[in-house]
């Protein structure tokens, strides 16, 4: 019963925070639509400030209501005046609060590439739209074979989003697995990794091609939860999550990673894929080490 009450209290406070701050965020987002040039940049900065304040209050709510220990590592030299590409393993909706706890007001506010269906999430869908989060429509290979005219649509969205990102410092978050990890998915994929699904290099390659010269570094984020199963969001709300490890390794980005054409150059494509696969091998080993803690 105590956990239920804790969950209800935490959820209520988070909802109240959302209701209070989504209004100002959307007002400034509308200013972005009508103001030109520097006016738009100032409005965009105001949107980011509201989002960061929203996130800081969410952090305070979790600290007040839940006993979760956020074990955050590798944040000592992060900066807010530069741009980053962040990659992370993906297991649960709790990954989002984990990124907020570790990156908010330590780096530029982060942007995700979201599934198009998420724009319909009450309140949050509007907030994500106001924050210029790109909404992607994912098509299966079989569907694209029947509708070849849709091939490359996500690339167009990625390029358009990255053009917006060039106007100010940004942290672009990319989940290379493309979906949340489960053991069933790992076995279905026949993934060679113990704790990860196979990575997809295409999305990160397009971000590098569009923003490479603007990016200061790669943030290699590894999130580990206690136990054999990742917690759900309700588990976080009701205080069932005792500890979350967020390990951040800052890596240099080789300019060669955006020096070619990923779509048309098979040699360059193999180079990027090999780089991603090596990152994933090291991340898999890192997860194993952190789980033993």
Name each model-derived stretch.
Residues 74, 87-90, 113-116, 175-177, ...:
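Short His-Asn-centered micro-motif
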Residues 12-15, 259-293:
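Accessory terminal regions of nucleic-acid processing enzymes
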Residues 119-139, 168-261:
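A cross-family acyltransferase "interaction/gating" segment
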Residues 96, 158-159, 200-204:
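Conserved glycosyltransferase catalytic-site signature
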Residues 62-65, 148-152:
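Short, flexible loop segments at the rims of nucleotide/cofactor-binding pockets, characterized by
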Residues 1-84, 90-92, 98:
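Membrane-anchoring hydrophobic helices of lipid-metabolizing enzymes
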Residues 37-42, 46-54, 80, 84-147:
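Catalytic core of membrane glycerolipid acyltransferases/transacylases, capturing the structured
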Residues 150-163:
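A Trp-anchored, charged/polar loop motif used as the substrate-binding/catalytic surface
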């Amino acid at each position: 019963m105590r956990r239920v009450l804790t969950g209800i209290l935490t959820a209520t406070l988070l909802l109240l925070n959302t209701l209070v701050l989504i209004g100002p965020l959307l007002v400034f987002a509308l200013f972005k639509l009508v103001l030109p040039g520097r006016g738009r940049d100032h409005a965009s900065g105001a949107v980011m400030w509201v989002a960061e304040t929203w996130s800081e209050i969410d952090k305070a709510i979790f600290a007040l209501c839940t006993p979760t220990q956020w074990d955050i590592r590798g944040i000592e030299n992060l900066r807010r005046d530069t741009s980053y590409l962040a990659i992370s393993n993906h297991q649960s909706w709790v990954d989002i609060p984990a990124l907020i706890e570790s990156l908010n007001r330590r780096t530029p506010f982060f942007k995700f590439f979201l599934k198009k269906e998420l724009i319909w999430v009450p309140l949050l869908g509007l907030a994500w739209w106001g924050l210029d989060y790109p909404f992607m429509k994912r098509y299966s290979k079989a569907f694209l074979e029947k509708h070849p005219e849709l091939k490359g649509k996500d690339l167009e969205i990625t390029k358009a989003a990255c053009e917006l990102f060039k106007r100010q410092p940004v942290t672009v978050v990319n989940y290379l697995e493309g979906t949340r990890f489960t053991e069933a998915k790992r076995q279905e994929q026949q993934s060679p990794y113990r704790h990860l699904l196979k990575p997809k290099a295409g999305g990160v390659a397009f971000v590098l091609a569009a923003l490479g010269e603007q990016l200061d570094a790669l943030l290699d984020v590894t999130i580990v939860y206690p136990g054999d199963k990742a917690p759900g969001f309700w588990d976080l709300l009701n205080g069932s999550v005792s500890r979350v490890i967020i390990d951040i390794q800052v890596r240099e980005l080789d300019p060669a990673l955006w020096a070619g054409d990923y779509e048309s150059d098979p040699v360059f494509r193999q180079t990027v894929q090999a780089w991603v696969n090596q990152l994933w091998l090291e991340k898999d080993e890192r997860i194993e080490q952190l789980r033993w803690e």
